[in-house]
């Protein structure tokens, strides 16, 4: 089905969060090294509470988060300190990180703020030990080369990494993060994805951003006419952005259709809670049979709508379940999907009878501890009443495939307040003017094709590679571009597909090997086995010795003479055409220890001698 996004009034904007590849964190001198949870050296526990803003208001998103009283566990390392623990004041803002953000702002033709003030953004989901995230506005009002507007660029501290629901790792907390916010100027799913790709290209062009899964996240703001602004958090895959937008448009259209149907039916929400625990004492449903309390409500004339699909894999009932889960319950049951899950038809009949439900009504039940059931039912009633409004303003999280689930209400202005522990930073015109704009990756691709003779796809791979700088350094050191590309790109890709841990190989080790190859000390044919050895943790010297043990010219001559003698009849029969096959046998035996040109020269002389004596 073709969707007319212009007719629907689609408006979208995007926020991109990218980790910066700095030596130190934003407000302490700890390294920005990602660790494994098993390497943790200690732990501590916290409960988090929301604080009121300067105006005495409590942020609605934080208020909802406080519904769940949770104890958070934090893992510490020998690369984290008391700043991450929120037991020591923050150090001054990282100047290296600020220069990177200012450079990106300059690329986007933005105006830097004259003085940077750090703010506190209230976050009590456990991802910050302090209960807030530090963020600073750096620049405003810019444009991308494609025309999309950039509203703001901020410098933030990264959140802690969630290991489990209430367990967080502090290795990531405090890594400098750039937040780029576009204006709501996009009107098709494809435009959103293209804009994200363009921003990603600019970020990578700096050579100062981290790479890998989790280092970049896209938040998408979407609304349609008569709908509402919804923020979708944490889209990590660029290729999924357009699909996420399409599915959110589908969801909002479906919710608006449900709104109109509810009005047409004269539907209503019955707020009386009914205890139906006794109806399921002998149920085949393990969840219901073992539950200490089962409560039910009747949604008048909601039949068929709670179970209606609003986007792939999601129904209106899924939305209600998301709200209920905020109270700690596992979910809900509703009569649009029953009998099922061990609930029999007789139990459904008795349930409807207990609530005086007609065939036009939908009954929802929740099973858990009494207090949780009460809380969950109030949330379900709240979400059911929102259905009469259409689309609620929400922050949502992306699910696999591109559909989304409710996270929390959209935060308000009460979420932000000044950070009193961090000094302001002046941004002088001289400082901003001194920053050099990096070469954009599109221009790098064109240059690699023209200067180095690389094919377009190879040039693109090399330009986007995190080893790009080392590749250029190798060429400036006298290494031929084709060999440098093999070493820093194509061979590493092949080895990675074979399972080699190529991320362990240091750029300087590859460069050292290339210098040895260029000097003739190591044959270029040995490049792949040498890189394999480097991936296993060998030093360049050890890797070369293992993969390409030195063979003297005298030893090589003996090897060639022996192989030629063994194949004398074949050589006499084929003449000079035998050179290729015999060359392959020799190269296999010397295993790249000798340059192919030298082997070819000695072999041709040996074959010539055999043919001369024939």
UniProtKB/Swiss-Prot annotation:
GO terms for cellular component: cytoplasm. It catalyses: L-glutamyl-tRNA(Gln) + L-glutamine + ATP + H2O = L-glutaminyl-tRNA(Gln) + L-glutamate + ADP + phosphate + H(+). GO terms for biological process: glutaminyl-tRNAGln biosynthesis via transamidation; translation. Keywords: ATP-binding, Ligase, Nucleotide-binding, Protein biosynthesis. GO terms for molecular function: aminoacyl-tRNA ligase activity; ATP binding; glutaminyl-tRNA synthase (glutamine-hydrolyzing) activity. Gene3D superfamilies: 1.10.10.410, GAD-like domain (3.30.1360.30), GatB domain, N-terminal subdomain (1.10.150.380). Its EC number is 6.3.5.-. It comes from the Archaea. Heterodimer of GatD and GatE. Allows the formation of correctly charged Gln-tRNA(Gln) through the transamidation of misacylated Glu-tRNA(Gln) in organisms which lack glutaminyl-tRNA synthetase. The reaction takes place in the presence of glutamine and ATP through an activated gamma-phospho-Glu-tRNA(Gln). The GatDE system is specific for glutamate and does not act on aspartate. Belongs to the GatB/GatE family. GatE subfamily. This is Glutamyl-tRNA(Gln) amidotransferase subunit E. It comes from Methanospirillum hungatei JF-1 (strain ATCC 27890 / DSM 864 / NBRC 100397 / JF-1).
